[in-house]
Amino acid sequence: MQIRMTEYQVPDPESGPYGITVCANGRIWFTEQKGNRIGMLTESGDITEYTIPTESAGASIITSGIDGELWFTEYKAGKIGKITPQGKITEYALPPGAAPFGIAAGCDDAMWYTDMAGHQIGRLSSSGEITEYKLPKPGAFPSFITRGADGALWFTQNQSGSIGRITADGDISEYPLPQEQSGPVGITAGPDGALWFTEINANQIGRITVSGKISEYQLPTAHARPHAIAAGGDGALWFTEWGAGQIGRITVDGDITEYPIPTADSEPHGIAAGSAHSIWFAEECGRIGKISIQN
């Protein structure tokens, strides 16, 4: 398989692009963690930016909601943000002390998020009502969250070295990983019905079935520090290697390929699938990257 990699410079090179998602209309939305903005990139490379009302909000993960709008976390401000396709931003304040990070749409028309500081999973209803669910173990540091094929929300617990699952009713299950200090971060639903996740400390990609069976795959590059992961339209999983400045691809059979990013010290974080032949990723160095898959 051949690929072509393209990079787009954001207006402020110090803005720190972090999270990224692709809308149904093909437009790419991303957070600027240091620039305190939400950016929108068209397929032709034009970028529009929208300033977040709260200063130094710490915008992190962004995702599409069931309502067609974009939802993002503000971990420093303790808020959940929503932005319309036209750029109108609404913020929802969480209970004091919250530090939301991961966010995903559930099957119940609500947005679910992880609270790293409160060690809990939160639910924000379409009417703005907030419900919180404490995790069994304190200090778990829940990170990314995604909806699984079973309708539940699955999330990584970075400090406890485990994968968590929560139902729409708030029932929580935990699945310890073989290495307690593996540091799981990103997680996504795979094309095989399983959940795939990154292990930033163990330098591995993990897979867990909805019944809890775990498999792990070691990365070829040492100290790659895999971060985010997304299911591509080509039937494989794509992930960022924050420490190595590479984008990785793993098939459902566990075959891994790595692609170096042209820009040095790119520090890739978020990643998302576009069309069947494109993958987009955010580089903290001030760029948005695109992989075009050429069969």
Curated annotation (Swiss-Prot):
Q: Which GO terms describe its cellular component?
A: outer membrane-bounded periplasmic space
Its EC number is 4.2.99.-
EC primary class: lyase
Keyword set for this entry? Antibiotic resistance, Lyase, Magnesium, Metal-binding
List, in alphabetical order, the GO biological process terms annotated in this UniProt record.
antibiotic catabolic process; response to antibiotic
An example Gene Ontology molecular-function term: magnesium ion binding
So where does substrate get bound? 227
Residues annotated as the enzyme's active site: 269 (proton acceptor)
InterPro entries noted in UniProt: Streptogrm_lyase, Vgb, WD40/YVTN_repeat-like_dom_sf
User: Record-annotated residues binding Mg(2+)?
Assistant: 267, 284
Q: Which cofactor does it need?
A: Mg(2+)
**Which superkingdom, per the lineage?**
Bacteria
* Sequence similarity: Belongs to the Vgb family.
The protein's matches in HAMAP family, at most eight in alphabetical order, are given as: VirginiamycinB_lyase
Q: What does this protein do?
A: Inactivates the type B streptogramin antibiotics by linearizing the lactone ring at the ester linkage, generating a free phenylglycine carboxylate and converting the threonyl moiety into 2-amino-butenoic acid.
Subunit structure, as described in the record: Monomer.
> What is this protein's record name?
Virginiamycin B lyase
Organism from which the protein derives: Bacillus licheniformis (strain ATCC 14580 / DSM 13 / JCM 2505 / CCUG 7422 / NBRC 12200 / NCIMB 9375 / NCTC 10341 / NRRL NRS-1264 / Gibson 46)
